[in-house]
UniProtKB/Swiss-Prot annotation:
CDD domains: PheRS_alpha_core. It comes from Syntrophus aciditrophicus (strain SB). This is Phenylalanine--tRNA ligase alpha subunit. Belongs to the class-II aminoacyl-tRNA synthetase family. Phe-tRNA synthetase alpha subunit type 1 subfamily. The lineage of its organism: Bacteria, Pseudomonadati, Thermodesulfobacteriota, Syntrophia, Syntrophales. Keywords: Aminoacyl-tRNA synthetase, ATP-binding, Cytoplasm, Ligase, Magnesium, Metal-binding, Nucleotide-binding, Protein biosynthesis.
């Protein structure tokens, strides 16, 4: 009977060693140590033996049971480790391989034009100044020679947050804040978002504006014309033709609207330019002495010019876009063209 136990042990150990999966190992465990397993049946048959035989064979059978249980646990550990290694090997990444290519994003067309404008002025010595989008009535209007009862306030609608707090309607307040902090000479542009309650094919409640300011001794309207001529030719091409029309802005005197020959019809007249052959592009003028006085500059000693342009307006003309609202609809087919 001892030989039978030894043979059972050898056979069980061989099957344990041959098991490659957790399922195979579980089947071997049930075959030998389960309720109806071979070793379990042997232990149950000990009741037919004498007391001395029970002690001898029972002790040996329990030793084999302990040994086999240990073998099963060891095999279970090995199989689990091999399984984990196999999973890790299957999921391993070769970090030396090139990554998956992905489509590159691109800057929004308005951002592209804004960055181009800022780059042009930065190259000729202008600094970029920024300010708050929520402004006081003073900086947005009064400091710019637009008192509360001034009819110029009717020239543009305004979002009022509170009675004396507005969403800025232009970036001109940045010029006032800069001049309050800095003595001449001043040479800045102030790009940023501005707000007016208006919405149609050529207006949106929020749009981007760039305003420029240059203050020093001896600055003339000729300097303004030369700067804007060079700037617009760099934006639209050397063949660009400009004209200056007298206009009115409360913070500049004299003031001028700047037009360029229509980039669509080349001055022949079309729907875009209203058959005039010209496109309004920006406003400009010499800084009004009253504005200088508001910031503590002596208008007898210093002069300067200012100008302002809508970035979306430039982008529309540059790319031939007829509806400003397309910029803000997040339509991929439209945006991917730029």
């Amino acid at each position: 009977m001892i030989e039978d136990l030894k043979e059972l042990q050898n056979k069980a150990e061989a099957e344990i060693k041959a098991a490659k999966t957790e399922t195979d190992l579980a089947a071997v465990r049930v075959r030998y140590l389960g309720r109806k397993g071979l070793l379990t049946q042997f232990l149950r048959n000990l009741g037919q033996l004498s007391i001395e035989e029970k002690q001898i064979f029972g002790k040996r059978a329990n030793e084999i049971k302990t040994i086999l249980s240990s073998r099963f646990d060891e095999a279970q550990t090995v199989i689990a480790a091999l399984k984990k290694e196999s999973v890790l090997r299957a999921e391993a990444l070769d970090v030396t391989l090139p990554g998956r290519s992905s489509g590159y994003g691109r800057a929004h067309p308005v951002t592209q034009v804004l960055e181009e404008i800022c780059a042009i002025f930065s190259e000729i010595g202008f600094s970029i100044a920024e300010g708050p989008e929520i402004e006081s009535d003073y900086y947005n209007f009064e400091a710019l020679n637009i008192p509360k009862d001034h009819p110029a306030r009717d020239m543009q609608d305004t979002f009022y947050v509170e009675e004396a707090i507005v969403l800025r309607t232009h970036t001109s307040p940045v010029q006032i804040r800069t001049m309050e902090k800095q003595s001449p000479p001043v040479k800045i542009i102030s790009p940023g978002r501005v707000y007016r309650p208006d919405s149609d094919v050529s207006h949106t409640p929020m749009f981007h504006q760039v305003e420029g300011l240059l203050v020093d001794r001896g600055i003339t309207f000729g300097d303004l014309k030369g700067l804007l001529n060079a700037f617009l030719k760099q934006i639209f091409g050397e063949e660009t033709v400009l004209r200056f029309r007298p206009s009115y802005f409360p913070f500049t005197e004299p003031s001028a609207e700047v037009d360029i020959r229509c980039v669509i019809c080349r001055g022949k007249g079309c729907r875009v330019c209203g058959q005039s052959g010209w496109l309004e592009i920006l406003g400009s003028g010499m800084v009004d002495p009253a504005v200088f006085e508001n910031v503590g500059y002596d208008p007898e000693e210093y002069s300067g010019f200012a100008f302002g342009l809508g970035v979306e307006r430039i982008a529309m003309l540059k790319y031939g876009i007829t509806d400003i609202r397309l910029f803000f609809e997040n339509e991929r087919r439209f945006l991917q063209q730029f």
